[in-house]
Amino acid sequence: MRKNEKRNGKALLPIVVFVVLYLGLGILFEYGLDIEMGFYKIPVVVIFLVALLVACIQNRELKLNDKLEVMGIGISDPNIITMIIIFMLSGIFVGIVGRTSANSVAYFILSLVPPQFAVVVLFVVSCFVSLAMGTSVGTITLIVPIGVAVARVSGFALPVCIGSVMSGAMFGDNLSFISDTTIAACNGQGCEMKDKFKENFFIALPAAIASIVILLVLSVKNYNGGFIEEKYDLIQTVPYILVLIGGIIGFNVFFVLITGILSGSVIMIATGMIAPTDLIGNMGTGAAGMFETSMVAILVAAICALIKEYGGFSALLYWIKKVFKGKKGGLLGMGLLVGLMDIATANNTVAIVMANPIAKEMSKDYGISARKAASILDTFSCIFKGILPYGAQMLVAVSAAASLGEVVSAFDILPMLLYPYMLLLSSLVFISTMKVTDGRQ
């Protein structure tokens, strides 16, 4: 198949179409037509399908069969397959344990700490779990149901609880040694993981501390004392405890989720909470709840494969390299580069992989060390991916909440994503105060 290596900014049109339709319809529904939860009413799969059709119509020099082959290669990426399997397993897990188990976990956690600090606990627990598991999506899958239950019983707004979970998940995703983003950034830039971790740590730690302080202030100001202590069944907390321990230890996310599924099934049947036939039905219902999320991942992969084939990403990379000058400018350029890739691909690992070659070339041109380049790529991919309304993290969080009977919009959660915003501020301070020397930094 013929490769199109030329730079073609018009190839980015599908992304523009998606953003215009998604935001435009959302604003129209929410504010123009005054539809409750207007953004949540938007069929995101249909919007992505329209964007895919636009991508297919472009570049008439390429035959349809060749375009289908390009899309097939993009969809078959191991990261996409892994993501979809995680989606399915997480849906099955939620379908099995349901609301009752999540509520028991929430009451148990709140019995250990003052209820006004429950949101801070959600953030810290998510940090540790994500750091150990190396996956923000897996962490969100495990902790969001607990956050939903905490919101129900503590009086805190649901977006605050979910935002705290997502923030903590992005902390670990950025720093974990076993995170796909860490592996991709270090391998692409040619540095040791421990060196990248040291660079990252001094950017991430101030952001995490600032997030905790803000959450503490919000907790004290907004807690209304509405928590009513209720009884909880410790046996129902076992599936969540097992997956939490597995995550903290650092077991593979597949193993952790399968453990939760098996333990939840045994406990639900043994305690008479559900009949075996109903359990199987709940598994199917839970998996079905993740179908839309999985379809989004597939469509995004197909769209991005075509954009890359047409030369859209090459044009984007060329523009960034041309605009930013100097070492500090080079670091900012790297950050914007991977951020734009994140916006375009909705996959931070893919964004880093795509940005790696040009970032490595920029490192040579600007005299930037491999460990610093890897740190910036991973950090900014975390920032942008953490706040994407159509990213996997947000989609999983919203889907998990919906599967538990709670309707929440991505735009309700966005203002509560404190850590990505603090991480952006910390990164900008780090770059602006960096001492510039003639050596390689």
Describe each region flagged by the PLM.
Residues 1-26, 58, 62, 66, ...:
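Long, contiguous bundles of hydrophobic transmembrane helices that form the permeation core
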Residues 4-7, 30-45, 73-78, 109-114, ...:
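Interfacial loop-to-helix junctions that mark the boundaries of transmembrane helices
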Residues 10-24, 34, 38-60, 81-89, ...:
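Hydrophobic mid-bilayer segments of alpha-helices in multi-pass membrane transport proteins
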Residues 41-49, 56-58, 67-101, 116, ...:
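Core transmembrane alpha-helical segments of multi-pass membrane transporters/permeases
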Residues 76-83, 107-125, 151-161, 230-238, ...:
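Membrane-interfacial loop-to-helix junctions in multi-pass transporters
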Residues 83-94, 114-146, 321-360, 365-366, ...:
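Hydrophobic alpha-helical transmembrane segments of multi-pass integral membrane proteins
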Residues 124-136, 167-173, 245-251, 303-305, ...:
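Transmembrane alpha-helix interface/packing and boundary motifs in multi-pass membrane proteins
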Residues 181, 188-209, 327-441:
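C-terminal transmembrane helix pair
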